[in-house]
Amino acid sequence: ALLELHADAIAAATGPGMVVEFGIGNARKVDPLLTALGSSVFAALDISLSALKEALSGLATRHPNTAMVGICCDHTQLNELPAHPALERQRRIGFFPGSSLGNFTPEDAVAFLRNARQLLAGGPLLLGLDQPREQALMEAAYDDAAGFSAAFALNLLQRLNRDLQGDADPAQFRYRARWQEQQQRIEMALVSTQN
């Protein structure tokens, strides 16, 4: 909602350039920014090739005059863009919305920001951060009574078994979500019930 309300002001403050999004997700957050900037190039970085393809397909429909470049990589580690004709001589505007940086350790956050600064070559970074949340609210969200979070996490074991020929028995694990006061975050884990 904030991006939609203030996209024009953000575009005026950043100036023109190619948008580089760190972790594309469903690509909905970048839509208003691309519209306001009128960017001719959008570079999406994501570890999931299928997420890149799906997100860029939708964006290309909504922004037919913007060249879409997907880069499958660990966007937390990348400090330079690969060679690509559309990416040459473009001023770069970084985009890392949401609150993902809050999930990093302080050291990893600093390393990510250093890499982003190098990758953006002096261009601005639009960074989304979350305000501190109450412990009870976070625990209710990540250890919900309906068990959606646990089911999602336990599904990872099924995917591991299917996609990587693993042999983990989901019945031998339990989901745990714990509030870490010092880091102001939830840490989720699958804990073995076996010795």
List each model region and its residues:
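Conserved SAM-binding loop of SAM-dependent methyltransferases across substrates and taxa
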Residues: 26-38
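Conserved class I S-adenosyl-L-methionine
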Residues: 15-25
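Conserved SAM-binding motif I beta-strand of class I
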Residues: 41-46
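Conserved beta-strand signature within the Rossmann-like core of class I S-adenosyl-L-methionine
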Residues: 118-132
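Conserved SAM/SAH-binding beta-strand->alpha-helix loop
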Residues: 48-50
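Substrate-binding/catalytic lobe of Class I Rossmann-like enzymes that use SAM or dcSAM, i.e.
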Residues: 131, 137-195
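A short, conserved alpha-helix within the catalytic core of class I
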Residues: 103-115
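Conserved alpha-helix/loop element of class I SAM-dependent methyltransferases that forms part
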Residues: 2-17
